[in-house]
Amino acid sequence: MAFGFPYPKYSQRRTFNGSADELFAVVRSALEDLGWRYKVLWGKEFEAEVPTAHWSWHHVFKVRFFAGGVIEAESKSAYSEILFDLGRNRRNVDKFFARVVDISTTHARDRSRSVTH
């Protein structure tokens, strides 16, 4: 469970194989699959809104790209009145990276099939 003042948040970085363009497309697909409305900032990062759920307020989700295939995801509670997030920010990040792994694995499998045929 994250605690933060004024806003609780959770972030994590993971490294993936693929070009910058491929990873950008994978992240876009992951956000769309999750149903999180997003906008692209400066052509190199995403900012999404995680829908409100039971016992959960609005969360802002950001994705940034770094050299070497590193993707950083951050989920942050949008209201300063919320001091504890009950693990929601970490679950948002985990859910996002699970989709990224699924999509990137599928893309890698499809690429290897097209090369062998």
Please name every model-derived segment.
Residues M1-H117:
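Ser/Thr-rich, low-complexity intrinsically disordered terminal regions
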